[in-house]
UniProtKB/Swiss-Prot annotation:
This is Glutathione synthetase. Residues 125-311 form the ATP-grasp domain. Pathway: Sulfur metabolism; glutathione biosynthesis; glutathione from L-cysteine and L-glutamate: step 2/2. SUPFAM superfamilies: Glutathione synthetase ATP-binding domain-like (SSF56059), PreATP-grasp domain (SSF52440). Keywords: ATP-binding, Glutathione biosynthesis, Ligase, Magnesium, Manganese, Metal-binding, Nucleotide-binding. It comes from Photorhabdus laumondii subsp. laumondii (strain DSM 15139 / CIP 105565 / TT01) (Photorhabdus luminescens subsp. laumondii). Binds 1 Mg(2+) or Mn(2+) ion per subunit. Gene3D superfamilies: 3.40.50.20, ATP-grasp fold, A domain (3.30.1490.20), ATP-grasp fold, B domain (3.30.470.20). Pfam families: GSH-S_ATP (PF02955), GSH-S_N (PF02951). HAMAP family: GSH_S.
Length: 316
């Protein structure tokens, strides 16, 4: 029997209709795997050994009672076959420390999804720089003059922080926007923080598409997150609505171009953000949208693809 650990935000406060981590747990349980639940505060390192307080977990697709804890134990993480690192951002120093603890277990043979070193290496906004031919015009700087110049050049731009999630602090600036100065000051904290600028993509009207890749294999359907009226952000957390649809030709082309690098880096479950035919983000920490895609296209099991990939890797 495969022993699966998961590190996640408190299971008591998730929305099971939308939570991809929950879908992963349901699929693992369906395969009779043993589920070990952990939060960040349960992880610790002693004399170089990665350990945790874990609770055995049972899950159920039930709106009121979706989980039940069984016995609690303190164990070496190397006794688990696989651990899903599903903690949501912020990607802060605490998150980084957790990846070092998980890396100690990985060195002893536990499969970590996604690979701890790659979680540190591949910032969700910056990692697109490794694929410049696929992205909009993108500038990363803390220099106000560079940002003003970029705004002048394009006339319609998006400015965003490098560490946000769910569409937080994303600004659209059109030509002659009177707020350009204060937005640059806010995002760069007066030149002390890097931020990202990209030319505005009108195709956002058709949605910001989340394309999932499972161990190098693109899922054939995506979730297009369509901005609410008067919004430029498609994020569901910012009021966008999700619409599942098959991948377009350009989605396939982008996914296939990026997939081999992801697989090589041990990034087994990844969400690409695509607007029109441009790649805007590569989400590696805890990508979502599997539930919504599976609900719309019951012929596909994304979590099934993931558990198959885990089984294959464990057999190697």
């Amino acid at each position: 029997m495969i022993k699966l650990g998961i590190v996640m935000d408190p299971i008591s406060s998730i929305n099971i209709k939308k939570d991809t981590s929950f879908a992963m747990l349901l699929e693992a349980q369906r395969r009779s795997w043993e589920l070990h639940y952990m939060e960040m505060s349960d992880l610790y390192l002693h004399q170089g050994e990665a350990r945790a307080r874990t609770r055995l977990l049972q899950v159920e697709n039930h709106p009121q009672q979706w989980y039940q804890f069984d016995r609690e134990q303190d164990l070496a993480l190397e006794t688990l076959d696989v651990i899903l690192m599903r903690k949501d951002p912020p990607f802060d120093t605490e998150y980084i420390y957790a990846t070092y603890i998980l890396e100690r277990a990985e060195e002893k043979g536990t499969l970590i999804v996604n690979k701890p070193q790659s979680l540190r290496d591949c910032n969700e906004k910056l990692f697109t720089a490794w694929f410049p031919e696929l992205t909009p015009d993108t500038l990363v700087t803390r220099n106000a003059a560079h940002l003003r110049e970029f705004h002048q050049k394009h006339g319609d731009v998006i400015f965003k922080p490098l560490d946000g999630m769910g569409g937080a602090s994303i600004f659209r600036l059109k030509k002659d926007d009177p707020n350009v100065g204060v937005i640059i000051e806010t995002l760069t904290e007066h030149g002390n923080r890097f931020c990202m600028a990209q030319n505005f993509l009108p195709a956002i009207k058709e949605g910001d598409k989340r394309v999932l890749i499972v161990d190098g294999e693109p899922v054939p359907y995506c979730l297009a997150r369509i901005p609410a009226q008067g919004e430029t952000r498609g994020n569901l957390a910012a009021g966008g609505r999700g619409e599942a649809r098959p991948l377009s030709e350009s989605d396939w082309a982008i996914a296939r171009a990026v997939a081999p690098t992801l697989q090589e880096k041990g990034l087994i479950f990844v969400g690409l953000d695509i607007i029109g035919d441009k790649l805007t983000e590569i989400n590696v920490t805890s990508p979502t949208c599997a539930r919504e895609i599976e609900a719309a296209f019951p012929d596909i099991s994304i979590t099934g693809m993931l558990m198959n990939a885990i089984e294959e890797r464990l057999e190697k």
